[in-house]
């Protein structure tokens, strides 16, 4: 089981197509055989700018006050789909990352959380239809990303969720400081590790870009 956990990074999303490839090409994506691939555009000591192509995901949405409660329900629903809960009864390979879309909100407000599993390469063209009407296919456009250092926050706990959100807010300030253009009101978290993984976790936060992302050498 892949779950969001420990993350510090942020990405810009644009428009274009994503490759699903062998995880051996990505040292930090080592718990599944296939991962979402990317091209490194530029980097600094703190950030990487990446490009991803578009790819097909299987997604579901859950509404809750707490992200961790919504994520748990959404994960179980999606896992049931890849474990045979589809019209073919087919078991589908787990991939990474697991993606979750989070809408900005006040702590006490309910919000929609949309979780997505990346479909493996062999199921990109014609995946089996879900038997649960709450599970849908989504084609996400290609995107560029900013990637920064990581921490080991556990998003399964409420305290760590607070920490994660504070880091997200910090990166928003960083984006604004370089006059980056991005869509407001939501962001994405990408998780690469099982909840059983205690060390060397790797997770990221994504923001959707509007226009070309700014490379580190353009910040000076």
What are these model-predicted stretches?
Residues 2-220:
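A solvent-exposed interaction/effector surface
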């Amino acid at each position: 089981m892949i779950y969001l956990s420990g993350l510090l990074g942020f990405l810009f999303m644009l428009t274009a197509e994503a490759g699903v490839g062998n995880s051996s090409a990505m040292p930090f994506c080592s718990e599944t055989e296939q991962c979402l691939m990317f091209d490194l555009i530029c980097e600094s000591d703190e950030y990487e700018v990446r490009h991803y192509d578009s790819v097909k995901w299987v997604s579901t949405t859950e509404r809750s006050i707490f992200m961790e409660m919504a994520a748990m329900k959404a994960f179980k629903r999606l896992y049931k789909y890849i474990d045979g809960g589809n019209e073919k009864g087919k078991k589908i390979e787990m991939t990474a990352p697991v993606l979750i879309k989070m809408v900005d909100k006040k702590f006490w407000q309910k919000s929609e959380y949309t979780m997505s599993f990346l479909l493996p390469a062999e199921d990109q063209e014609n995946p089996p239809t879900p038997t649960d009407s709450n599970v849908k296919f989504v084609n996400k456009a290609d995107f560029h990303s900013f990637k920064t250092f990581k921490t080991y926050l556990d998003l399964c706990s409420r305290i760590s969720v607070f920490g994660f959100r504070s880091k997200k807010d910090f990166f928003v300030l960083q984006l604004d400081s370089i006059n980056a253009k991005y869509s407001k009101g939501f962001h994405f978290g990408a998780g690469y590790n099982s909840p059983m993984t205690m060390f060397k976790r790797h997770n990221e936060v994504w923001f959707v870009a509007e226009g070309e992302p700014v490379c580190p050498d353009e910040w000076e």
